[in-house]
């Protein structure tokens, strides 16, 4: 069967911009090259002519600050750019430049938004309605159209994230290829990473710089007396607190500050089901520790972003103490009950209690509490073979062969996790929607992928969770379809 083909070829109009918009341009070019059989023409906006606008279909991306065309389209009401700097407006249809041509437009107030817009275009529009190549023998007009080659449905979308900070929580030695890891984060429109590490990687600054070039914030995590049982000191003694305060301030200044990271994540002695240590209430003691140590850091670095990783198991019945944690510190809650806080996505027993507890802690320190949470139900470390790092290491530089081999080893775990995310997605969605609503979008939500080989493939459960962070009020079945249909997502 012959298809009706577009009479005009596409040219991509671009401007010299930063790494994020360059990433978007690269991905757009790669996408279009999957469909067309001709070499794509890239044209600097300053070199654009009236003749080319009439001759070709046009794809253009940018912001009002770096593109005069985008600015004029925005001022004339042709594109509707969201106020949110992570938001974007994407449109595919009849060209505003020539009545018998087509145009693809992606506009935002920031380069990050442009990047997210192109990612969304790839994941949603070209996954739902397109075939992967114009030369595919299985192309069927009853299912697919061929993008950029034949007329396809007009498309328009204005979008911004419901949750501003969407992150991955992981261990440093479980990032095997940091460049691919961060790229796959961007393909899920994630904005931050929290990296727990025993030692600072020797290439930490290079890694942080690369993350920043893609608009990803980096928080390094380390112990503030996380496991006092394995260490020879008594957390109830003031001299222990004084010793740890000096140690932490010194470690931050000498090790983590030079990396250029955006902040610090820490855990103390709350990862236990007991609510007291040697007769002292853990919630009261940890609040004293956290406030004392952080005050010393804030004295010298008042704009430092601190995240307190708090396990609810030891403090859930003593929240009156936790409410006194310095409001400048973001409390990042975990182990708050059933899935999506539970490691096993099968475990949804007691969900209503978990939902009620989440509702309570969201505004524990007031209506504008600096709230965060770690959601689980993804691959974890294998604790039966785990060893702590013994010294400095190089992060994320393993070979492609290593990554592919280890990824195959993780496939069985992903299959189990995928099955229960499919069955219990509504529970995760309810929690995430509550966080987005009650925090007015200011929650810092992290999904724990401790050893899931994100640098190799974006697996369905992580893509679904990321999608929920962006648009938690979309109905569950639509979210499931979007995640499953995405060009970049793999099913186990």
Model-predicted segments: where are they?
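Catalytic-core regions of glycoside hydrolase
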Residues: 49, 145-146, 150, 169-173, ...
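Solvent-exposed alpha-helical segments and adjacent loops
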Residues: 1-176, 180-187
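Acidic, low-complexity N-terminal propeptides/linkers enriched in Ser/Thr/Asp/Gly that mediate export
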Residues: 14, 491-492
